[in-house]
Regions:
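Short, hydrophobic/aromatic-enriched beta-strand segments in well-ordered soluble domains
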Residues: 137, 174-185
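Solvent-exposed beta-strand/loop surfaces of large extracellular or lumenal domains
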Residues: 143-167, 187-193
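Aromatic (Trp/Tyr) and acidic
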Residues: 1-138, 142-145, 159
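A short, sequence-level motif marking secondary-structure junctions
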Residues: 117, 159-163, 213-217
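Generic recognition of long tandem-repeat/solenoid scaffolds
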Residues: 121-127, 164-167, 199-202, 229
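Short strand-coil-strand connectors
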Residues: 107, 151, 203-204
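Glycine/proline-rich low-complexity spacer/linker segments in large multi-domain proteins
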Residues: 181-228
Length: 229
C-alpha cells in the first residue's frame, strides 16, 4: 500500500541517513495520499455519487487506478498511522542543530514550519530556540532557483549533503528563515498491468493532471492533450 511504502521510505531515511528518501515520502503524500482522500468536493463535483457523512475525510481501496475513491476504517487507520509517523519526524533537534527533514506544516516548542505553493514553493521556518538550522533541499528542485533568506536578507549558506546549514550566529529566537524554489513542470507515462497507459502532468512533486481520466471521484484534474497536427 502507499502508506506502507511511505513508512518504509521514512524508516530507511531515518536509520540509514539517506536524506533523498524524504523526497519519496513527500512525493507519495502529495501525489497520492492527499488526492486520494474523500472530500466534500467529490460529492459536489459528482452529485450522483452518494456521499455518507462518515465517508468524508476517509481513505480506502479505490475502484480504478486513479479514481473511485473508497472509504473504510482499516484504510483510514493505516493512512492516519502513516501521517502521524511522518509528522513526528518532520524535524528533530540534533547535535548539529534544528534539522528540517521535510517540508510540511509543523510546530512544537523548538520550531514552527509553514509551507505554501503558488508560482513557487515556499517553506518558512521560525526557530523557537537559538540554534543552527539545517534545511533539506529537495533533489528535484533546480539548484539555480533555490533562495534562502533570513529576516528578509538573502544568504548563501554552506550545504552539507542535501542540507543547507544556517548558522545560529545569523539567527535569533523568532527569526524567519524562508526557503524558496521553483516547481518544475514535467510529464510522465505509466502503463498498468492490464495494459492501460496514463499520462501525468507534474508540478514539482505533485500531479496536476492525468489523461485519460477515470470517474467517479477522480484523484486528479483531467490533463488536456492535443491531437497531432
Amino acid at each position: 500500500s502507499t502508506g506502507a511504502a511511505i513508512r518504509l521510505a521514512l524508516w530507511l531515511a531515518l536509520h540509514t541517513g539517506r536524506a533523498e528518501l524524504y523526497d519519496d515520502v513527500e512525493r507519495l503524500i502529495r501525489a497520492r495520499i492527499i488526492p486520494g482522500q474523500t472530500t466534500e468536493a467529490d460529492g459536489r463535483d459528482d452529485p450522483g455519487t452518494a456521499m455518507p457523512r462518515l465517508q468524508l475525510g476517509a481513505w480506502g481501496a479505490n475502484q480504478y487506478p486513479h479514481a473511485g475513491k473508497g472509504a473504510n476504517p482499516s484504510g483510514t487507520a493505516e493512512i492516519a498511522h502513516t501521517l502521524s509517523a511522518v509528522y513526528q519526524h518532520i524535524t528533530a533537534r540534533e547535535a548539529a542543530g534544528l534539522v528540517v527533514r521535510m517540508h510540511f506544516d509543523y510546530a512544537d516548542d523548538s520550531i514552527e514550519i509553514t509551507t505554501s505553493r503558488n508560482e513557487e514553493a515556499t517553506t518558512t521556518v521560525r526557530p523557537r530556540v537559538h540554534d543552527n538550522v539545517l534545511l533539506r533541499l529537495p533533489a528535484w528542485a533546480p539548484a539555480e532557483t533555490v533562495r534562502i533568506t533570513v529576516d528578509g536578507r538573502q544568504i548563501s549558506p554552506l550545504t552539507v549533503g542535501r542540507f543547507a546549514c544556517v548558522p545560529k550566529e545569523l539567527l535569533r529566537v523568532g527569526s524567519e528563515i524562508v526557503l524558496r524554489h521553483a516547481l518544475p513542470a514535467r510529464q510522465t507515462t505509466e502503463t498498468m498491468p492490464a495494459g492501460d497507459t496514463y499520462q501525468f502532468a507534474w508540478r514539482g512533486d505533485e500531479i496536476v493532471g492525468v489523461h485519460p481520466n477515470d470517474w467517479p471521484m477522480p484523484f486528479y484534474p483531467t490533463l488536456e492533450t492535443r491531437e497531432p497536427d
